[in-house]
Each structure stands twice: as C-alpha cells, then as structure tokens.
A protein has these predicted regions:
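Ligand-binding pockets and gating/stacking loops
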Residues: 1-478
Length: 478
C-alpha cells in the first residue's frame, strides 16, 4: 500500500476507448488510489465491500474422510483427507462440524436443501401437470423453496449501487429426479418457483459480467432469469478481444498519474485479460491467442464459447477466475455457485468414475463417492486460492469475503440430517479469524446461518421455519 498517490481515483472508474465508433468500457479492480492511505477503506471513508457467497454441492459427505481428529485453532487441528486441497488457504477456513437438523419432519434431498439454504418450511411441494407415456395428464409434486434462500436475504440488505444485486453460477446441469422441481437446478430463490438460474458456461458469464459495450444494468434477477441482460448478440468475439487494445491508451494515460504499485496492478490487470484469452479457448481444446499473465487483479476477461463436461476442471477454474474478477471490481457483493444439484446423478470421467454420483452414495459404501467429494472440494479450494492471490485494498479478496460451503444432507446413504459439516472460507472483512475447526454436536444449522447473516451486518434476531432460533455461534471467533 502506497501512502501517497499522485491522484485519487473513483471506485467506479473504468478504462474507456472506442471500437468502430462505439464507446467501450473496462472495469478496474480496487486500486490504492481508490483507498485511504492504509488501504482499509475507500478514500471517501466508505468501507471496502465485504461479500457473501454460497458454494453448494449435492449428495452430502462421508464423515470418515471429512472429520479432523481434533478441534481447535491453528496447529491444534489438521485438515482431513477430503479437505487436503485447502492446505494453502487453511488459515482462512472455519470448519464447523456436528450440526443437526433437529426438527426433521422429513428426510431427503429436497427437504435438506430447503433447510440448509432457506431455513426449511413445512410446505415444499407445488402441484404441476405432467403427461405420462400414454399421453394422459396427471398431477405430480415438484419441490421448490417457499422461503427466500439466505443469499437473497443478504443481497436485499447489502445491495447499494453494485451492477448486480447477486450473481449465480453453476457447473453441472441437473440430471436427477424431476420431482426435485426448481431446487434441483437452481440454488438462489426469492420465493416459490421464483428462482435465479445459475450460468454454467464461461461465455454467458462474460456476457453478463463484463460487457464490452457498456457496464451491466443495475440489479439483476427475476424468475428464472438469473441476472441482468448481457451485451448484444451481434458483438463478435473478435471485437471483444480487441477491447483491450481500445482502452490501452486510456490505461497508459492513467498509469502516468498513479504510483508505482497501482501501475503494476493495472499491468497485471491487462495481463490477466491476455491470460484468459488463452485459458477459455484452451478449455475447449481449440487453442488460444495472445500472451500469458497473472490473474491477480484481472477484471475483464474475454468471451468464451461453452465448455463441455469432459473439460470440467478447466471450466471450473475459468468460472472461478471470472467470479473473483467480478468481486475484485465490486460488480456484486453476493454470489452463489451450485457445483451440482441435490441428488445429482452426474458422472465424473475426469477421475475415471463413470457411474452416477447419487447411485454411488447408495451402493456398497465404496471409495467412489469419497473420491468424487474430494474432487469437488479441490475445485472449491481453487476458488479460495484465487481469492487469496487477488489483492483488494491492503488485503485480498479472501479477506473480504465469507463463503458458506454446504451440501443438502450429511451422510448420504440414509439421507442423514445430523452431523453436518460446513466449510466456511474467508475472513468476512476481519470478523472471522479462520484456521479453526469448531465441533458443535447437536447444535442447529439454523444457528450457523443466523450467525452468518449477523457477520454480514444484517439486523436479524432469529431465523428459520424449521428449527427457528435466536441463538448464534460466537464459537466461530472466540
């Protein structure tokens, strides 16, 4: 952090240029010149934004490879087998184990996802008309969320002038039981059947987050829409890639007015764009163009074509970097990533497992589901590592975020709703010390989610329909 800058820059400053007579803009990450001299707040006194996210995966966990041998902080506890990929970011992890769903009226994937994300509700099913194989119409149930999911509650409270009120991404399309209804494919809900669909290909994410023609429209969301409209469809990939050249003159002019550290940060920002020009096409096996560079302060990646499931790791890591870029540029303060849906039947050829994940969990208790869980956690860990490597003010994006890592059930074989393991990542703007395993047997999941809302600054005293509580968990930081 430089104590003095030649120029103060607005937090909403964008590099600008023109392509064929069309004005273009490129967001900047948080620079020292936007902050006070300590890098702890914006220059006008406004606090650096703290973001909240949910990282969800389907089909639960196997506690034998998920539970540390000891609780405590620092070196008193060690990462269990399936969380080993978090070693580089263990200092930002708060692992909470032993939590229960006490008011367990029902057991199952749909009920679990309602509970851990929206506090549960006794009326999950809506009737929908279907057609059977004989062409006869009948009514069947479809599960949905009857309460807003916690990310949307937090988004309502935190949103000010960020371009996106919340942003939803995902990885694996849902292939499970159709009775899962809207909760099978969609994490974020604002009410019954009012969901915000996750974006699952890098091209769509680019279009909505990093418009080359104009900044995204404020707000975002809507029933099934999933966010603000993207750039016009007739803007070609070639044109988008040339945006970097269009704004280069403005970037060089700005660098002349800034200190050395901010100049380096802008260089890294531009290098990051070049790096993703390679990353996204290569994820499809098509090759790329341009140079390489750090993603440390990248803010505006190029467009990408869809990535196939066979390239799942490349796709996942690309989406992670796009999401971190959005956070570093303060495009949103609330995000969710739905790796897979509850009761997901996805296969994992990337780790030589071609059977369905859900079927493995109800099989002979072999290693297959444990290996899938380990792979999924490696991708969650990748997101945290990119956040730690991305500066924000005097710290990093990981310092200024809080992620609720959760699945809908605990042990999946019997749909157990006891001994949930929640993987929290980030320091929540300095409110969570991290590097801690907190064992709280018999405590309610709703207590944890209420605590997360209060950490994010919400004035809420109780939460939940099932297991409604006003009790919180100071054990996370004391």
């Amino acid at each position: 952090m430089e104590l003095l800058n030649k120029l103060r820059v607005s937090r909403r400053f964008a590099l600008r240029g023109a392509l064929g007579g069309i004005g273009v803009a490129m967001w900047l990450p948080v620079l020292d010149a936007m902050c006070n001299n300590n890098g702890t707040a914006f220059a006008q006194g406004e606090a650096l934004p703290t973001s909240f996210g949910i990282w969800f995966w389907g089909n639960g966990i196997h506690t034998d490879v998920w539970t540390p041998k000891a609780a405590g902080s620092g070196d008193a506890w060690q990462l269990p087998t399936n969380l080993q990929d978090f070693a580089e970011v263990k200092d930002a992890m708060t692992l909470v184990t032993g939590l229960d769903m006490l008011d367990a009226k029902f057991k199952g994937h749909g009920w679990g996802v309602a509970y851990v994300l929206a506090g549960g509700d006794g009326n999950l099913c809506s009737l929908t008309s279907d057609i059977d194989r004989g062409g006869n119409q009948f009514e069947t149930s479809r599960q949905t969320q009857y309460q807003p999911t916690v990310d949307q509650t937090i988004a309502d409270a935190l949103h000010t002038n960020e371009p996106f009120k919340s942003y939803e991404t995902g990885m694996i399309p849902f292939t499970g039981d159709v009775a899962m209804g809207t909760v099978g494919s969609n994490l974020a809900h604002r009410g019954p059947s009012n969901f915000l669909a996750p974006r699952r290909d890098p091209k769509a994410i680019f279009d909505e987050l990093f418009s080359a023609v104009a900044p995204p429209a404020p707000g975002g969301g809507g029933s099934g829409a999933g966010g603000s409209a993207g750039v016009p469809s007739d803007i070609s990939f070639k044109t988008r890639r040339s945006v970097l050249d269009a704004v280069m003159q403005d970037a060089n002019r700005l660098k002349m007015t800034l200190g050395a550290e901010d100049s380096k940060r802008i260089d890294a920002h531009m290098d990051g764009i070049r790096e993703l020009e390679n990353r996204i096409p290569n994820a499809n096996g098509t090759g790329g163009a341009g140079g390489t560079g750090s993603t440390g302060t990248m803010c505006t990646p190029p467009e990408a074509p869809p990535v196939t499931l066979a390239d799942i790791t490349a796709k996942s890591q690309t989406i992670n970097r796009l999401l971190v870029a959005a956070l570093s540029c303060n495009l949103t303060r609330v995000y969710s990533h739905m790796w897979s849906g509850p009761r997901s039947d996805s296969s994992y050829p990337v780790i030589q497992l071609n059977g369905a994940h859900h079927a493995y969990t109800h099989g002979d208790d072999g290693q297959e589901p444990r290996k899938i869980e380990r792979y999924i956690m490696s991708q969650y860990a990748d997101l945290a590592k990119v956040m730690k490597a991305t500066p924000m003010g005097a710290g990093t994006v990981l310092d200024k975020t809080l992620i609720y890592g959760v699945s809908e059930v605990a042990e999946p074989h019997d749909h157990v709703m006891k001994n949930y393991h929640m993987v929290l990542m980030g320091h929540g703007g300095g409110k969570l010390p991290g590097n801690r395993h907190v064992r709280l047997p018999g405590r309610k999941v709703t207590e944890l989610v209420l605590t997360l809302q209060q950490i994010m600054g919400l004035n809420v005293e109780s939460w939940g329909s099932w297991d409604r509580t006003s009790k919180t968990m100071p054990e996370l930081w004391t």
